[in-house]
């Protein structure tokens, strides 16, 4: 196949900068083991990515969505909003359950005086020095 030029792809993706981003993202996907949709023909991954875009075997919109998704660090999930009354009922039930749990569990912790703490610290043995540093 002849060399893939920007002119072959520019009618599929209007912006040249976006084309570079999409082709780079697709080339990284290919490097990570994604299936290619055109014959390899001994070409490198960026050329294959451009050929896939030029031949329209991949949708630029799908590539763009995948690129955006790969760059997101926090994905917000749309959850259906509950009615105000349902939320109030759930909150009241949670408060009542918490009060009941507190009364049943009454967790106690051991108390330590400052002198006991200092005596424990003095009794600690320092770790042996090693040549790993």
Swiss-Prot record:
SMART domains: RNA_pol_Rpb6. It catalyses: RNA(n) + a ribonucleoside 5'-triphosphate = RNA(n+1) + diphosphate. Its EC number is 2.7.7.6. GO terms for cellular component: DNA-directed RNA polymerase complex. It is an enzyme of class 2 (transferase). InterPro entries: DNA-dir_RNA_pol_omega, Pol_omega/Rpo6/RPB6, RPB6/omega-like_sf. GO terms for molecular function: DNA binding; DNA-directed RNA polymerase activity. The RNAP catalytic core consists of 2 alpha, 1 beta, 1 beta' and 1 omega subunit. When a sigma factor is associated with the core the holoenzyme is formed, which can initiate transcription. Promotes RNA polymerase assembly. Latches the N- and C-terminal regions of the beta' subunit thereby facilitating its interaction with the beta and alpha subunits. This is DNA-directed RNA polymerase subunit omega. It comes from Mesorhizobium japonicum (strain LMG 29417 / CECT 9101 / MAFF 303099).
């Amino acid at each position: 196949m002849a060399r893939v030029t920007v002119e072959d792809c520019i009618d599929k993706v209007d912006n040249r900068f976006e084309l570079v981003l999409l082709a780079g993202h697709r080339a990284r996907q290919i490097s990570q083991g994604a299936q290619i949709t055109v014959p390899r023909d001994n070409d490198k991954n960026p050329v294959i990515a451009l050929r896939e875009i030029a031949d329209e075997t991949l949708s630029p919109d799908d590539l763009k969505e995948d690129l955006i998704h790969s760059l997101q660090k926090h994905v917000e999930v749309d959850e259906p909003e509950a009615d105000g009354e349902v939320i109030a009922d759930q909150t009241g039930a949670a408060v009542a359950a918490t009060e009941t749990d507190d009364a049943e569990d009454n967790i106690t912790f051991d108390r330590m005086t400052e002198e006991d703490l200092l005596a424990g610290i003095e009794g600690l043995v320092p770790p042996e020095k090693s040549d790993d540093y």
